[in-house]
Amino acid sequence: STVDASLYNLLVYVDDASSENSQSYSFPTLYRLSKDKRGNVTKEIIREYKEQVSTDPSVMQEVMKRAFTEYPAESYGLVVWSHGEGWIPSPLPIVKNASTRWIGQDGGHYLNITDMVSVFEAVGCHLDFILFDACFGQSIEVAYELRNNVSYIIGSPTEIPGPGASYDKVVPAMFASENVGVKVGKAYYLSLIHISEPTRRTPI
């Protein structure tokens, strides 16, 4: 399916895992993706940042405020593509070596769900959907934390395949004219069920 770029905006914030000293390093950048007349994907740089911890709530807040201010819309959705372990905050000093639960990782720094809620409330946004393209992104606890900020939460209570979703299938659903959350959920599920075992182990 095609998406009319004149009606919608697809913004992507990228902070890759390479170190500042590596040849492949690039600064954290906010892009706007679209297609040219030939159907080729193009990316426009909206803002290039200095090196920063992208899981810091203040960083997420600045990026979201910029996106909403410069590209206002009738509705919004969010995709979080990263690692994840769910809901219990990180760090967890009470029990040594216990697994913590979080969504989003930048080196040794993590974004807790409660921090994400604080960002949404500071920005003043209500999302049509949030897609956690990350392991352990869906649970009753996560849904409860986000109940006042998001209409639909899409994710997996277990691991997901390493590459994540097939965005050629998911992106058109993100810009559906109605039932966006339902359509994103279906597109995400369908993009994963065709992956052959043993990689596929992802309830949605």
What does each model-found stretch correspond to?
Residues 55-66, 115-118, 138-141, 145-148, ...:
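Extracytoplasmic/secreted proteins, especially bacterial periplasmic and envelope-associated proteins
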Residues 75, 79-88, 94-165:
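Catalytic cores of nucleophile-dependent amide-cleaving enzymes
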Residues 2-3, 63-70, 119-123, 146-149, ...:
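Structured segments of extracytoplasmic/periplasmic soluble domains
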Residues 167-175:
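Short, surface-exposed amphipathic charged segments that create phosphate/polyanion-binding patches used
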Residues 193-204:
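Single conserved hydrophobic/aromatic residue that forms the stacking wall/gate
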Residues 1-79, 84, 88-117:
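Divalent cation-coordinating acidic motifs and surrounding scaffolds
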Residues 177-191:
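A conserved active-site cap/scaffold subdomain adjacent to cofactor or substrate pockets
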